[in-house]
Amino acid sequence: DGSWEDAKDDEFSVFSMPEAAERASIVFLLLPDEIAPDVYEEKIEPNLSAGDLLNFAHGYNVMYNFIEPRDDIDVTMIAPKMIGAAVRELYTENDGAPSILGVEQDATGNAKQRALALAKGIGSTRAGVIDGSFKTETVLDLLNEQFIAPVITTAMMTMFEVCRDEGYPPEAILLEMYLSKEYTHTFEKMAELGVVEQLELPSQTSQYGQLKGGNEFESPDIEEFMQDKYEELESGEFAKEWAVEQEMGYPVLNRLFEQYRESEFVQIEQRTIEAFGLGPDE
């Protein structure tokens, strides 16, 4: 993928995974969940030494036992609550992304101190480090993806369908909901000021409508959906299902992508993005 040459151009010493694992006393396993177990078993674990530290950025494979590290190494997690590119960008700005720290295995007696040093090394201690666990990070991360994201997407699709059926221009609906990026700004202000305090920024009409609507909205279906998702994660049911899906070649994932991409919502969305020049700069 070119990363080997990029690293050499940046004057890093570059080695194969087995050689890097053998040379290092601290190994960051920063690979996609789907491929990390095989890579660890074949290329990393045989080359680790007693007392080494194996660090993860996500707790998934350890929590669900797809990776079971040997007993004589420290196993830690520094999980920045930010995408990788932004972690680096914040670091160069003398800032940092907050992280969740977890210690799964403390073979040396110094695993937590070593993990904190790693957190400092990527800038996270400038922002804050939460003392958590692999389970804490995994369940909250997946709940955000499997509960919050579907609720938001379903709400937008519902508004689109209802307003379109009432005769409103589809393009105007999409721009109002998210294509204008107004909500990008709103979410930034939520993070900076708080969910309620950021309401001081829009008009009082908006303030009244949002707060009153929040009080009026009660849906046992959402609470039940949330509880179901939590239990799937807690029990390991989702992890087992996803493992089978990978083994079968992603038939359900591919079907779901096709289903959504063929929907009227996405078709009109893509045309609107193109028409208004809203896509990424080439």
Language model features with spans:
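NAD(P)-dependent Rossmann-like dehydrogenase/reductase catalytic/cofactor-binding core
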Residues: E171-E282
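Rossmann-fold dinucleotide-binding core
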Residues: N55-E145
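Glycine-rich, highly charged phosphate/nucleotide-binding loops
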Residues: D9-E19, M82-I83
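Active-site-proximal catalytic alpha-helix in oxidoreductases
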Residues: G109-G123, G128-E166, E171-A191
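NAD(P)-binding Rossmann-fold cofactor-contacting core
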Residues: D1-D10
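Small-residue helix-packing motif on alpha-helices
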Residues: W4, A20, A36, P170-L175
